């Protein structure tokens, strides 16, 4: 555990070759926590793979805390982790929300980055939040209705727009009523889960202990996603305007054509703003990175990124 200040402690772990170039994995959400399977995208003989739970989620403590939990705080945590690891430069692999965090860190600390692998891009602009919370109703009306019904059931009022949705959900998540919070969090998580992939998603576990673990994660995810969408991201600038600070670094982007959570336009806009970005749109997949074709493209991108990092190091006469 790494003490990052503000009462937060961050859980981290390492895999692979400690003497190889480092890649740090940035999970989605915010609040999603690490998926150990993500380490499989990187050859353990050729990468020092580091993953960690961002503030308030996974094994990091305190759980689901929104206190001192902003993008700026998370960027500072990643810099503290780099210092803890004793490394000068590192690659970043971001998934969904983790792509925005990776770009934000790179903009703040370009001198400590070797390259980026980004999948299922989330830019975090107002238009992106609007789409996820309201616009997607055009494709998944019944799924969106279930979320609105859950808000109505827990607040007595059914939202009619994105601002109302966030305001009413905020009343529930900031309340001291655990049952209400869990009820809405379950539906919030289900809402996202049902749109994750082109193919049907696996059902929820039936074992009571496993289901309890899943629902605990649902609560953390819902609270932190809501916190960032309602309070943090609207106050931040458009990162696309600052990508030039890292535009000289290699970047591999993998995105599903039918990603309805984060439409492919976000990946295209990022690639257009990044001179050294290579964009691959997987033609038959959505947001889920573990879909077979998406996973294979990410594997390929990790190998390509390593070659590009090595080539840059050779050209500059430095270690990768």
Predicted regions and their residues:
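Conserved hydrolase catalytic core segment
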Residues: 88-130
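Conserved alpha/beta-hydrolase "acid-adjacent" motif
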Residues: 260-266
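Catalytic active-site module of serine/aspartate enzymes centered on a nucleophile-bearing elbow/loop
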Residues: 277-320
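Conserved HGGG/HGGXW glycine-rich cap/lid loop of the alpha/beta-hydrolase fold
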Residues: 5-62
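Short beta-strand/loop motif that positions the catalytic acidic residue
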Residues: 246-247, 253-255
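A catalytic-pocket lid/entrance helix-loop region that shapes and gates access to the active site
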Residues: 113-166
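Conserved acidic catalytic loop of the alpha/beta-hydrolase fold
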Residues: 72-90
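Active-site nucleophile elbow and catalytic-triad environment of alpha/beta-hydrolase enzymes
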Residues: 226-243
């Amino acid at each position: 555990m790494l003490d990052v200040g503000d009462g937060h402690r961050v859980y981290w772990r390492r895999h692979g070759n400690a003497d190889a170039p480092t890649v740090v994995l940035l999970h989605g959400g915010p609040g999603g926590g690490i998926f150990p399977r993500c380490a499989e995208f990187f050859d353990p003989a050729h990468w020092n793979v580091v993953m960690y739970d961002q503030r308030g989620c996974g094994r990091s403590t305190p759980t689901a805390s929104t206190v001192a939990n902003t993008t700026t705080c998370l960027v500072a945590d990643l810099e503290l982790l780099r210092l803890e690891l004793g490394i000068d430069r590192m690659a970043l692999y971001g998934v969904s929300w983790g792509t925005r965090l990776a770009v934000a860190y790179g903009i703040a600390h370009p001198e400590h980055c070797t390259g980026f692998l980004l999948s299922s891009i989330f830019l975090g602009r107002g238009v992106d939040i609007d789409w996820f919370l309201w616009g997607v109703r055009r494709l998944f009306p019944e799924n969106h209705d279930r979320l609105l019904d859950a808000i109505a059931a827990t607040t007595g009022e059914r939202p009619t727009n994105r601002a109302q949705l966030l305001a009413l959900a905020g009343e529930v998540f900031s309340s001291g009523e655990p049952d209400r919070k869990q009820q809405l969090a379950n539906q919030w998580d289900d809402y996202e889960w049902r749109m994750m992939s082109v193919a049907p998603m696996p059902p929820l576990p039936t074992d009571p202990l496993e289901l309890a673990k899943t629902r605990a994660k649902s609560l953390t995810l819902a609270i932190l996603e809501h916190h960032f969408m309602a309070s943090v991201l609207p106050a931040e600038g458009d990162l696309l305007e600052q990508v030039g600070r890292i535009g000289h670094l290699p970047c591999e982007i993998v995105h599903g054509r039918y990603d309805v959570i984060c439409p492919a336009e976000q990946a295209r806009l990022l690639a257009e703003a990044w001179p050294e970005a290579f964009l691959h749109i997987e033609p038959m997949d959505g947001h889920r990175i573990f879909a077979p074709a998406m996973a294979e493209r990410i594997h390929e991108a990790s190998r390509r990124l390593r070659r590009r990092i090595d080539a840059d190091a050779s050209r500059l006469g430095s270690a990768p």
